[in-house]
């Protein structure tokens, strides 16, 4: 299977989605280091700027290479050049099934940026990558992520009870799915 590729840059009505680089590490660290962003997204807060740089230089590209994942995007509000969040595919379940994930700085919550960014990536993935299905997981307490999934037309497929989150707390793990055939009628 050839490497999944996406354009370096996408634009939506209010956002620019672009590949993240080490030059973005400081912007990314400002939100990835926040517990209210990191824990609901399933990872511990990034401790140092150096840790974020290492992630961008090594962990992210190695994961993408190993799982044949497209690079994904940083979320930039038009008129700025600052990355305030990310949207990407973080896991390949099968050749034609990817899992989408997203994060956003709390200063930008409640403005509809994540659904707008995810919609652009989902549309591109179904059209250009030939995916059959896109999956999304979130913890039961993450009401914002649940709303994003529902707004984008995902169907709740499973509730896995009493899983541990990134802090070791017991909570439900919700699994959503969106088929290409469902996306085509939206």
Outline where the language-model segments fall:
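Acyl-donor (CoA/ACP) binding surface of acyl/acetyltransferases
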Residues: 1-38, 72-186
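Hydrophobic residues in alpha-helical segments
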Residues: 32, 41, 63-65
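Conserved GNAT-fold acetyl-CoA-binding loop/helix
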Residues: 36-59
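Short, surface-exposed helix-loop/turn micro-motifs enriched in polar/charged residues
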Residues: 43-44, 67, 96
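A short hydrophobic/aromatic micro-motif that marks alpha-helical segments and, especially, helix-coil
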Residues: 48-50, 63, 168, 183
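A short helix-loop-beta-strand connector motif used in the catalytic cores of GNAT acetyltransferases and
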Residues: 59-74
């Amino acid at each position: 299977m050839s490497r999944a590729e996406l354009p370096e840059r996408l634009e939506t009505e209010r956002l620019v989605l672009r590949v993240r680089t080490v030059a973005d590490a400081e912007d990314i660290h400002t939100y990835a280091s926040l517990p209210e962003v990191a824990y609901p997204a399933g990872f511990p807060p990034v401790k140092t700027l150096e840790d974020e740089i290492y992630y961008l230089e090594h962990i992210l590209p190695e994961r993408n290479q190993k799982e044949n994942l497209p690079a994904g995007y940083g979320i930039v509000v038009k008129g700025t050049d600052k990355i305030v969040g990310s949207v990407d595919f973080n896991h390949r379940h099968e050749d034609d099934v990817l899992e989408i994930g997203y994060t956003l700085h709390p200063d930008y919550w409640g403005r509809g940026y994540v659904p707008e960014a995810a919609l652009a990536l989902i549309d591109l993935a179904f059209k250009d990558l030939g995916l059959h299905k896109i999956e999304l997981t979130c913890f039961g307490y993450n009401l914002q992520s649940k709303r994003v999934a529902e707004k984008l037309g995902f169907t709740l497929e499973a509730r896995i009870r009493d899983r541990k989150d990134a802090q070791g707390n017991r909570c439900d793990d919700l699994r959503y799915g969106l088929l290409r055939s469902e996306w085509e009628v939206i």
